[in-house]
Amino acid sequence: MAGRDPRDRAPRVRNRAPAAVQITAEQLLREAQERQEPTIQAPKQRVQDLEELSEFQARKRTEFESRIRYSRDSILAWTKYAQWEASQNEYERSRSVFERALDVDPRSVDLWIKYTDMELKARNINHARNLFDRAITLLPRVDALWYKYVYLEELLLNVSGARQIFERWMQWEPNDKAWQSYIKLEERYNELDRASAIYERWIACRPIPKNWVAWAKFEEDRGQPDKAREVFQTALEFFGDEEEQVEKAQSVFAAFARMETRLKEFERARVIYKFALARLPRSKSASLYAQYTKFEKQHGDRAGVELTVLGKRRIQYEEELAYDPTNYDAWFSLARLEEDAYRADREDGEDVEPMRVREVYERAVANVPPALEKRYWRRYIYLWLQYAAFEEIDTKDYDRARDVYKAAVKLVPHKTFTFAKLWLAYAYFEIRRLDVSAARKVLGAGIGMCPKPKLFTGYIELEMRLREFDRVRTLYEKFLTYDPSLSSAWIQWTQVESAVEDFERVRAIFELAVQQSLDMPEIVWKAYIDFEAGEGERERARNLYERLLERTSHVKVWISYALMEIATLGGGEDEDGNEIEGEAGDADLARKVFERGYKDLRAKGEKEDRAVLLESWKSFEQEHGDEEMLAKVEDMLPTTRKRWRKAEDGSGELEEYWDLVFPDDEKEANPTSFKFFQAAQAWAQQRAGQGEEGGLSYDLPSDSESENEDEDGDNREEEGMDQD
């Protein structure tokens, strides 16, 4: 690299602008082509006399002989040599070369074909025939030689000779294409009987469904439908009735049915389809069934179409279940499909047995979920319920339906979980059979094995329908002994006692309920208070509120307490339909409740609850109070202020938040700033009220006004405006 001359480097292009004249790739190629030097061509030699010809031929033969001497196994060299001799009209020499080549490789198909082509070009027909005889004798499994031989004879209009060649060929039992060529030869010369005989020999040699169908189609096309039926019947007898053979012969059945359809023999076609489908499993006859469905849609009645669609869907569901036997959705679909088919047959007046439906249900319930988890059993249990409903409603086999319920109950692992819907369905089945004692035994057994709220509730609902109130009370006692924390159960029991107007028992039940550790005690207290309020017992309701406030001082309790004091209790209608006026409420008592609630929430520092209480108090004063009390409450309403506090993540940074600021809290925390703030607020309101033309008052409020500003802030502002 160090010794390279710097002048050898390519010049650096300084001007990168495009040239004025652009040169295309096409121009470059054209110039390159034009500048190429002409290739050297060998001089042409002309043969002037026989002596020169002999010399030329001798030289060429020497070259060919030298070439085949060094590459004796090269068939291409032998072929070129022989073809050159033939081009010199030296056919004897050409034959000699071909024979010498055949001695080297007598099984070269290409060599035989080139040899025969040479004889045919020289119009030596007999020589070519002799060569074809030798070739097919030596190579009988090479179809190309047979085809060329037959083509030669037919080209010479020697049909009998071509037939003889085919006969020799058929003795070797060639492939189907050879048989078809023989048949087409006979068809070209209208020898249909001979062609039919060839079909028969072909079938004897290769009895596969495709060949049977081709033979029958040939007979149909030449106007022999009876012969075509005979062919199909022979084929079906040959294949037999075994499942494996029928599966193999599906194409024969389909072609047979299509032929009958073309001949307008629809009943024959339907029988053929049904015969084949009855001997094949659904999973192996999808294609045949699709053709049958299409046939019924075109030529069948409504019942036939429905039957085919039913079968097609049945195959689909069976395939899904074969892949996953625990696919209960597929079992449901298959069971409903069979039920619909059973009902349709009964509506048509047919005497059918429900065996297929029962078989589906038995197969379905045999696939028990693999895990003892309720989520896997939910869909499975519905199979049993649907099975029992089918036996009860459709077949009217009540004993079998009872057996289904018993089997389902026995199968469920009740120690782990149970299904109340199963027990209740079983019990209501016994009720429909007018056996109340059996229904009670079923539900009692369910509660004894695995008690659960839904089972108790269903049993109680049953007894309520039967108007057995003593049994209902007993069941509620057992229910609440099992789980005394269920608030809904206590409330339902009181509703039952209220319906029979046993109010003392209702109060006793409520008293027991509020003493328990309930899951939702608030709804029990609310129901208790609503009951007393509904009966017009204001004092009892007031006592309940006081007891509840001892347990919790939630803002909703205070609001509800206050609204109870203002509400009218005990109204309604008597037995004669006359309206009874209730006891009117007392607004002062309600206001005192609001004040108590506000003070209690303020003491506990519940700002949001105080704001909610004040909003309810404001609504109360708007409806039941006067302007003075409304103004007082409005002065107590909080305002929102933006404040800062340290972040909770411990980073020391300040974060912004909105806080509720109550006037009484501000006054108590900083009286001086509160007075100033009140004065500024009054000044702002005064300025907004008077506009630019009015004068402004800078008088601070007096001490007496300051003391009462929580009560009459708005009145103070009005007085200040009047003084101005």
UniProtKB/Swiss-Prot annotation:
Main location, first listed in the record: nucleus
Family: Belongs to the crooked-neck family.
Ranges for region Disordered: 681-724
Subunit structure: Associated with the spliceosome.
Annotated Acidic residues bias: 702-724
Entry keyword set: mRNA processing, mRNA splicing, Nucleus, Repeat, Spliceosome
A UniProt-annotated Pfam family: HAT_Syf1_CNRKL1_C
Xref: InterPro entries: HAT, HAT_Syf1-like_N, HAT_Syf1_CNRKL1_C, Syf1-like, TPR-like_helical_dom_sf, TPR_rpt
Gene3D superfamilies in UniProt: Tetratricopeptide repeat domain (1.25.40.10)
Organism: Cryptococcus neoformans var. grubii serotype A (strain H99 / ATCC 208821 / CBS 10515 / FGSC 9487)
Function: Involved in pre-mRNA splicing and cell cycle progression. Required for the spliceosome assembly and initiation of the DNA replication.
Compartmental location: Nucleus
Coiled coil: none
UniProt repeat feature HAT, residue ranges: 55-87, 89-121, 123-155, 157-188, 190-221, 223-262, 264-298, 308-340, 352-386, 396-432, 434-465, 467-499, 501-534, 536-567, 585-626, 635-667
GO biological process: one example: spliceosomal complex assembly
Protein name: Pre-mRNA-splicing factor CLF1
One Gene Ontology CC term in the entry: Prp19 complex
